[in-house]
Regions:
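A hydrophobic, small-residue-rich beta->alpha segment in the mid-to-C-terminal subdomain
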Residues: 43-67, 71
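A generic structural motif
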Residues: 26, 37-38
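Active-site-proximal beta-strand elements of phosphoester/diester hydrolases
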Residues: 16-22, 41-44
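Loop/turn-rich, solvent-exposed surfaces of beta-rich toroidal or solenoidal domains
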Residues: 28-30
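Active-site metal-binding loops of divalent metal-dependent hydrolases
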Residues: 24-25, 45-46, 89-90
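Short polar/acidic secondary-structure junctions
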Residues: 22-23, 34
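Divalent-metal (often Zn2+) His-rich catalytic cores of metallo-beta-lactamase-fold enzymes
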Residues: 9-12, 33, 39, 50, ...
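Metallo-beta-lactamase
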Residues: 1-20, 63-82
Length: 105
């Protein structure tokens, strides 16, 4: 088990990198996934709903408002690079953009 304090590159090839997204909880992290044709940021609870980021809404259960707003800015900066953001609890985002289960052909 490795304690992660800053960015951590799992395979030393930039394919999966953690980024700190403190605010929701003291040690919140996101996963930046770099594929050949797309990039994704799995934000987990750092951005529960896309509207939280768009309107800089801080959920009531956030540990530290100032840190969460810093994380929002970091995510917005990454989003300028056309990274696909995956929110932790946004049913509308998941329902409109992602498959919700396994599809068999």
């Amino acid at each position: 088990l490795k304690k992660i304090n800053e960015e951590f590159d799992f395979f030393n090839n930039s394919k999966i990198v953690t980024i700190d997204l403190f605010g929701h909880t003291p040690g919140s992290i996101g996963l930046l996934v770099n594929l050949d044709k797309n990039q994704f940021l799995i934000a987990s609870d750092a951005v529960s709903l896309l509207r939280n980021l768009e309107f800089e809404e801080v959920p009531k259960n956030a540990w530290n408002k100032a840190e969460l707003l810093k994380s929002y800015q970091k995510i917005k900066k990454l989003s300028q690079k056309k990274i696909n953001l995956i929110c932790g609890h946004d049913y509308l985002q998941w329902n409109q953009n992602f498959k919700l289960g396994i599809e068999y052909n």
